[in-house]
Design a protein with these regions (language model features):
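N-terminal basic, low-complexity leaders that serve as flexible interaction/assembly modules and, when applicable
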Residues: 2-102, 139, 312, 320, ...
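Short, flexible, mixed-charge acidic loops at enzyme active sites
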Residues: 45-47, 96-111, 163-174, 289-290
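Short, flexible active-site-proximal loops enriched in glycine and acidic residues
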Residues: 80, 109, 149-151
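Short gly/ser-rich anion-binding loops that grip negatively charged ligand groups
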Residues: 55, 59, 63, 119-130, ...
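Short glycine/proline- and acidic residue-enriched helix-loop micro-motifs
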Residues: 52-54, 115-125, 180-187
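Active-site loop segments of alpha/beta catalytic cores
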Residues: 129-364
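Iron-associated oxidoreductase/ferritin-like identity signal
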Residues: 2-3, 10-11, 119, 135, ...
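A gly/proline- and charged-residue-enriched helix-loop-helix capping module
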Residues: 103-143
Length: 364
């Protein structure tokens, strides 16, 4: 594709349902994509994963990452695609040595325990140390339908920090929370360092072809309000503001799971949209943030493990709850789970499409 064609395609994507919804502009029907839409619920994903041999090889091989990114687009025709990668790539290239243990999830060979561990963290060059990610973005952009926007993403500084301190996942992230309390200066340094590195990483994704960006704050909800503002919100706000200064036309979605108490503060970061989990109604979120941001969400993922009738009603209820007017991107309240039958996603997509095309009427 020559430069003129590439520019034209970018402009067309800016007018897509997904991008218009993020700008709170009118659309013909509610756009839909799903968090973790490329994943283990799809047989084609499992086949590619088996071919790769392990998760890091899958995520770190541009051709394979492109293949699994495209699979849900080819099957369901979602209104947006999201890069297949992992939020822990950055600490991995900082030397913490990431691995994935079956049944246990991510593990780091090295962890953050002392202030010196933070001071010794390198600043990776995203076009060098994470070059495979950028090559995947470039390849996906080439292979995606020209009109389909591509979402780049990263983990929030706090969420990434939890894994770096704990050495893996945790039920309550007590070690990470204790680090904030006992080593607040080192913790702030860690969050600031991760914010700078994440900003560079996301800017590189934009330069490589991403049309929109998303920050996942999976574990902000484990923090007290004061700790959330100091160690989670501030890091995300720094990332949003720096990227917006350089790319005001690139929308940023913040998804902070379990953080309904902080919706107003999250909307004030300067982001264009907030992801909402299923513990908050869209109508309440909309009332609280007004017209400052679009909303994305928020179907409980377990609905997709039920029946077609339950899915149809739950989707209709979600759309009814948002109500009339622009600014809604349909999604789940968290990632799709491996036990979801692929045909249930067909029901989900069809119900969203039909609701907005007039084949379904709002429930009363």
């Amino acid at each position: 594709m020559n430069e003129s064609s590439s520019t034209s395609a970018r402009m067309n994507r800016r007018e897509s349902r997904f991008m218009r919804a993020l700008r709170r502009e009118p659309v013909d029907q509610t756009p839909i994509w799903l968090m973790r839409q490329a994943g283990r619920y799809l047989p084609e994903y499992r086949a590619t994963r088996a071919k790769a041999g392990d998760f890091l090889t899958l995520a770190g091989t541009p051709e394979l990452a492109c293949e699994v990114t495209l699979q849900p687009i080819q099957r369901y025709g979602f209104d947006a695609s999201i890069l297949f990668s992992d939020i822990l790539i950055l600490p991995h290239v900082m030397g913490l040595e990431l691995s994935f243990t079956p049944g246990e999830g991510p593990k780091f060979a090295r962890t953050i325990r002392h202030p010196d561990d933070v001071r010794n963290l390198p600043t990776p060059d995203p076009m060098n140390e994470t070059r495979a990610v950028m090559q995947a973005v470039e390849l996906i952009r080439q292979e995606l339908p020209a009109e389909t926007p591509l979402i780049g993403f990263a983990g929030s500084p706090w969420t990434v920090a939890t894994y770096m301190i704990e050495g893996g996942s945790s039920k309550d992230f007590a070690k990470a929370r204790r680090f904030l309390l006992q080593q607040p200066e080192a913790a702030e340094h860690l969050i600031q360092h991760l914010a700078r590195c994440t900003t560079d990483y996301l800017l590189a994704q934009v330069a490589s072809g991403a049309d929109a960006l998303m920050l996942f704050d999976s574990w902000g909800g484990v923090l007290s309000p004061s700790l959330f503002h100091r160690f989670s919100l501030n890091g995300m706000k720094s990332i949003v503001q720096t990227i917006q200064q350089q790319h005001p036309d690139v929308p940023i979605i913040l998804f902070a799971k379990g953080c309904a108490f902080h919706l107003e503060a999250l909307a004030d970061t300067g982001c264009q949209a907030l992801g909402i989990d299923w513990t908050t109604t869209l109508s309440d979120a909309r009332r609280r943030v007004g017209d400052r941001v679009a909303l994305q969400g928020n179907l409980d993922p377990v609905v997709l493990t039920s029946s077609a009738a339950v899915i149809e009603q739950a989707v209709q209820d979600t759309l009814d709850d948002y109500g009339e007017g622009p600014g809604h991107v349909f999604n789940l309240g968290h990632g799709i789970t491996p036990d979801v039958p692929p045909e249930h996603v067909d029901v989900l997509v069809e119900t969203v499409r039909n609701y907005r095309s007039g084949k379904l009427t709002p429930s009363t």
